[in-house]
Amino acid sequence: MKESSPINEERLFQEFIKLAEIASPSCRERQIADYLKKRLTELGLAVEEDDTAAKIGGNTGNLLARLPGQEGLEPLFFACHMDTVAPAEGVKVSFKEGV
């Protein structure tokens, strides 16, 4: 029997599909950046974008998202990429036998 989890697996699954299907080739991550800014803001994070795009000839800077912590607890830091490797456009996620 599967243990109960505070994670909504179906919501996580659907969010993964949305993210994986958004075109995001290197230096052209605008579409996924806009989606992430919207979602993170909806979740209560303060989101800003730096000026890296102008420095590297891209269309998107780095996103910095902050969520206030709680007094006495250690802070967490996450870092990730928005760009994807080829093929970065026209991707359709498919699952077979749960994978």
Task: Indicate residue ranges for each PLM-predicted region.
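N-terminal capping segment at the start of a domain
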Residues: 2-30
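Intrinsically disordered, low-complexity segments enriched in polar/charged residues with Gly/Pro
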Residues: 5-6, 50-52, 78-81
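Generic hydrophobic, helix-prone segments enriched in Leu/Val/Ile
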Residues: 16-19, 38, 47, 93
